[in-house]
Structures are given as structure tokens and as C-alpha cells.
Amino acid sequence: MRLIPLKNTTEVGKWAARYIVNRINAFKPTADRPFVLGLPTGGTPMEAYKHLVALYKAGEVSFKNVVTFNMDEYVGLPQEHPESYYTFMHSNFFDHVDIPAENINLLNGNAPDIDEECRRYEEKIKSYGKIHLFMGGVGVDGHIAFNEPASSLASRTRIKTLTEETREANSRFFGGDANLVPKYALTVGVGTLLDAEEVMILVTGRGKAQALQAAVEGSINHMWTISCLQLHAKAIMVCDEPSTMELKVKTVKYFSELEAENIKNL
């Protein structure tokens, strides 16, 4: 596992965006051989999307031959709802870059057959071979995507019941009323994430410190689903200073020295 210790949210977003652009450009994608990118929603990746759009507008990257798969979507929320992840992705990213509509893959939380929708999503991912890079965030309780505590580490795309903690955390997008946050969501599984060639998790804020500590220094534990990344061959945690507050000083020092060349000139 790599840990990229940065100062603030802006640096986290800038580093993540540059990393994605470098990976896409090094891959040299074509229509027949697209780069497959996994994407999250929420507050944490907002800076990354802002910088990705800026890099696209600067002519440093094209998304024409990039295929995307999003992590999750609420069940029962209309697609056009301002807080649907469909709306979020189009407002913050897709509508500002040159990605073709047919290359965008989002879970349908209003599908008539939810189980079939989840199977279809998994099959679509497999049809591309694998996801080359999956960017994600982490919840205060260590969940990745909507794989809440006690999720199977072998799980695939499925419907999940959201915890009260998650609904409370997401209530800030629903006028502060947790009762307006849907109770269920479709999400890629932990196993789906682990199948990706590379996983990059963005961690920002003091509230995520315990989750980061569990991921980096704790044992592999389904109560902290983020800890599954210890099993991944190419996992990267990109974090700001407040989120490292629960890590041992020597842990932060170790990774700061190890990644010194990769975090300068931000």
C-alpha cells in the first residue's frame, strides 16, 4: 500500500487528478482499447473533479476513449433529482469533458429488477476485462462505496441498507434531514473493487482519521471495509494532514520520506 500524505483537500484533489491523467495518457487508450476508470461521488472527490476538468480544458487529457463505472447510486431517487449520483456526475464532471455518453456507466436505482441490474453491471465491467483505476472515498465508519461495516470482503454489486450514521452524514446534501436520505443504495462490492488493477482512495478531514488508521495500521476486518485494501497489490491512500491524526508519527514520517519525490511541487 502507498500512502500519499499531503497538506489539505486542494492538494489531495490536485494530486489525484494528475495521477489519473498520467495513467490515462500512459495507457494511450483507443476506441477498441479504452481506459476503464471507476469513479465516486460525495464531497471528497469534488476537488479532484475540478482539477480533472481544468486539465482537460488545458488540453492535457482527453476522455474520448475512457469508459467509466460509478461506485453507487441511491435506490428510489429519481434520476433527475438534484442529489442523485447521476445528477452529481453530470454536473461536476461528465458535462465538462469530452467523454461520449455511451462510455458512461451508472447504476440504475429505479430499475424494475434490482438484482438483474446488479448482475448486468458486473457483467458490463467484466466485458471490458477489468477496471484499470478505481478512485474512491471512505466514510467515517470506514465504508467504501456503500459497503457498510460487516460487508463481505468478497461481495459483488448489490443492494445495501444504509446505516443511520451514513444517512446522517449524507443529510447535509438533503437540507440536513436524514429522513430524506434514501434507506437503500446499489453499490459495487468489496470484491468488485479488489478486482480493479489499481485502487486510489481519497481521505480528507479529521472525521476520517480513525478510518485511515484502521486502513493503514489496523488488521483486516470486515467492520472496517476500507481495511480490505491491505489485500490489494496496488492500493493508494491520498490523504490530507487532518486525516492522519490517528496514525503513528513514525508511520506518517515513513511515508512522507518514501513519497517525497512524488509530493513536491504541488
Swiss-Prot record:
InterPro entries, alphabetized: Glc/Gal-6P_isomerase, Glucosamine6P_isomerase, Glucosamine6P_isomerase_CS, NagB/RpiA_transferase-like
Q: Which CDD domains would you find in this protein's record?
A: GlcN6P_deaminase
Q: Which UniProt keywords apply?
A: Allosteric enzyme, Carbohydrate metabolism, Hydrolase
* Site annotation Part of the allosteric site: residues: 151, 158, 160-161, 254
- State what inhibits or activates this protein: Allosterically activated by N-acetylglucosamine 6-phosphate (GlcNAc6P).
- One Pfam family, short name please? Glucosamine_iso
Q: For this protein, what is the EC number?
A: 3.5.99.6
Q: Which SUPFAM superfamilies match?
A: NagB/RpiA/CoA transferase-like
- Report one GO cellular component: cytoplasm
Q: According to its UniProt record, which reaction does this protein catalyse?
A: alpha-D-glucosamine 6-phosphate + H2O = beta-D-fructose 6-phosphate + NH4(+)
Q: Pathway, per UniProt?
A: Amino-sugar metabolism; N-acetylneuraminate degradation; D-fructose 6-phosphate from N-acetylneuraminate: step 5/5
Looking at the keywords, is Hydrolase present? yes
Q: Which GO terms describe its molecular function?
A: glucosamine-6-phosphate deaminase activity; identical protein binding
Q: Which Gene3D superfamilies match?
A: 3.40.50.1360
Active site at which residues?
72, 141, 143, 148
Gene Ontology biological-process entries: carbohydrate metabolic process; glucosamine catabolic process; N-acetylglucosamine catabolic process; N-acetylneuraminate catabolic process
| Family statement drawn from the similarity comment of this UniProt entry | Belongs to the glucosamine/galactosamine-6-phosphate isomerase family. NagB subfamily.
What this chain does, per the record?
Catalyzes the reversible isomerization-deamination of glucosamine 6-phosphate (GlcN6P) to form fructose 6-phosphate (Fru6P) and ammonium ion.
Q: How does it assemble?
A: Homohexamer.
Q: Which HAMAP family match?
A: GlcN6P_deamin (MF_01241)
Write down what this protein is called.
Answer: Glucosamine-6-phosphate deaminase
Top-level taxonomy: Bacteria, Pseudomonadati, Pseudomonadota, Gammaproteobacteria, Enterobacterales
This chain is encoded by the gene named nagB
